[in-house]
């Protein structure tokens, strides 16, 4: 029992800074929305529309680079720290390549926005302007993620927390300057949020670069040692590890976007109630998501040491801690669901709808915790292809169709509206959780040599 308690402490020590970093990132989006909304409803809507395109695009790049965390963790655990710098340099090349692709997508976003039904021309123009501004921050964000993944692979999660919080503080005055046109800058409204966010990402990258070159714990990792040409073999291997994770993230984000579109014809009350339940669940999701990062680090480090049994301890401890935390947040959601809904909106019908959906959201949190931490464990084992197949099957072949049938048709039960889609979420996430656990158990039953060879690849 003692080994599980010790492991739980190590996991929480890694996870807590990740939670704070994620809260800072989320708060940046909230600040953008509030400050753009103070100019006009059109500017606020433009930021929302722009973000709906920006988020899947940047999360694809983010997911691709997550391959670095288990790679660095295993090199660190096996005492091969001298090889880390080369992997990270290739991570920068990979980030540069995917930055170009994402920037091209964002630059041509006007074609997507103009296809939206009945969109106001002024809103469309502002949304495109927001995307054309924020796209210049793509390399800065992805370069920052490369160095953050290096630090997290070395079990250093606090730098990401501190720099993320500083980024939030820097974002507010830069927003103020470019949204309202202060100190000689043009008043750009919602477009100014894009300028500010792009600037902040470059500031965060430069701060992280400064940290890794001066941190005593990383003095042996010489990133700046001469020019490093692309190593296509390493980049191919990192892409092979990261692409399934990137696609899984992309499918998850687009699933929620599709459900939002399917709910929208059901009326303002249904949309508002669904959005409140989803927004609050997203906040609660940060806890298991941070444990997922910690699980990747701990499992990867233990496999690097050749300690297969300790990797199992890390895997099961992370899921047990995640389930415990999810149980607490689920009870909190059930008990305070009406109070939570009132924080978002005071309309009685909306509060009633949101409160009803939050009962389902409480169940959703349990399955969500297991599947996201299971995903982190599998990343630690470098078994990322299974993550893609599991999430695609669970979300798009089980969750969405069942949600559609329950929410909008009478084939099984009378149409349930948004509640039907939430039951679909629960079905999909529960399936993902079960499949993740089964895959982890299958992996752990393999011969030690097979597990270590796979992890060392």
Curated annotation (Swiss-Prot):
GO terms for cellular component: membrane; plasma membrane
InterPro entries for the chain: MATE_fam, MATE_MdtK, MdtK-like, Multidrug-R_MdtK
Protein name, as recorded: Multidrug resistance protein MdtK
Keywords: Antiport, Cell inner membrane, Cell membrane, Ion transport, Membrane, Sodium, Sodium transport, Transmembrane, Transmembrane helix, Transport
Membrane disposition: Multi-pass membrane protein
Keyword Nucleotide-binding: no
UniProt KW Cell membrane keyword: yes
UniProt function note: Multidrug efflux pump that functions probably as a Na(+)/drug antiporter.
One Pfam family named in its UniProt record: MatE
Species per Swiss-Prot/TrEMBL record: Yersinia pestis
Subcellular location: Cell inner membrane
Family of the protein in this entry: Belongs to the multi antimicrobial extrusion (MATE) (TC 2.A.66.1) family. MdtK subfamily.
Gene Ontology MF: a single term: xenobiotic transmembrane transporter activity
PANTHER family: FMN_FAD EXPORTER YEEO-RELATED, MULTIDRUG RESISTANCE PROTEIN NORM-RELATED
Transmembrane segments: 11-31, 46-66, 93-113, 127-147, 160-180, 188-208, 243-263, 283-301, 316-336, 357-377, 387-407, 418-438
Species classification: Bacteria, Pseudomonadati, Pseudomonadota, Gammaproteobacteria, Enterobacterales
Any one Gene Ontology BP term: response to antibiotic
């Amino acid at each position: 029992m003692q080994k599980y308690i010790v492991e739980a402490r190590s996991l929480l020590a890694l996870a807590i800074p990740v939670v704070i970093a994620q809260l800072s990132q989320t708060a940046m989006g909230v600040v953008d929305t509030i400050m753009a909304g103070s100019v006009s409803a059109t500017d606020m809507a433009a930021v929302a529309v722009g973000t709906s395109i920006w988020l899947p695009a940047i999360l694809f790049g983010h997911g691709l680079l997550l391959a670095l965390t288990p790679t660095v963790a295993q090199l660190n655990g096996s005492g091969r720290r001298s090889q880390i710098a080369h992997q990270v340099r290739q991570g920068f090349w990979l980030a540069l390549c995917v930055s170009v692709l994402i920037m091209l997508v964002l630059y041509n976003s006007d074609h997507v926005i103009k296809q939206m039904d009945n969109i106001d021309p002024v809103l469309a123009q502002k949304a495109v302007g927001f995307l054309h501004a924020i796209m210049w921050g793509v390399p800065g964000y992805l370069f920052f993620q490369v160095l953050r993944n290096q630090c997290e692979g070395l079990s250093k999660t606090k730098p990401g927390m501190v720099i993320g919080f500083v980024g939030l503080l820097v974002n507010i005055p830069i927003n103020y300057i470019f949204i309202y046109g202060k100190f000689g800058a043009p008043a750009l409204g919602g477009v100014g949020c894009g300028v500010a966010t792009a600037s902040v990402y470059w500031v965060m990258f430069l701060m992280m670069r400064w940290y890794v070159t001066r941190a005593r714990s990383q003095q042996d990792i010489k990133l700046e040692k001469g020019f490093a040409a692309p190593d296509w073999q390493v980049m191919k291997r990192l892409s092979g590890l990261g692409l399934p994770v990137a696609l899984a993230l992309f499918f998850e984000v687009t699933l929620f976007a599709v459900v939002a579109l399917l709910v929208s014809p059901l009326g303002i009350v249904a949309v508002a109630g669904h959005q409140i339940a989803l927004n609050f669940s997203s906040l609660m999701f940060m806890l298991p998501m941070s444990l997922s990062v910690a699980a990747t680090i701990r499992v990867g480090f233990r496999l690097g040491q050749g300690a297969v049994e300790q990797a199992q301890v890390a895997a099961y401890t992370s899921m047990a801690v995640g389930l415990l935390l999810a149980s607490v947040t689920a009870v909190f959601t059930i008990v305070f669901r009406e109070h939570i809904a009132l924080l978002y909106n005071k309309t009685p019908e909306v509060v009633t709808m949101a409160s009803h959906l939050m009962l389902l959201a409480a169940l959703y949190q349990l399955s969500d915790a297991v599947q996201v931490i299971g995903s982190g464990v599998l990343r630690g084992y470098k078994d990322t292809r299974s993550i893609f197949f599991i999430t695609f099957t669970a979300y798009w072949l089980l969750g969405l169709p069942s949600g559609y049938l329950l929410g909008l048709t009478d084939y099984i039960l009378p149409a349930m509206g948004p509640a039907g889609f939430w039951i679909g979420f629960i079905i999909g996430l529960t399936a993902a959780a079960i499949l993740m656990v089964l895959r982890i158990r299958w992996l752990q039953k393999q011969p030690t040599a097979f597990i270590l060879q796979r992890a060392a690849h």
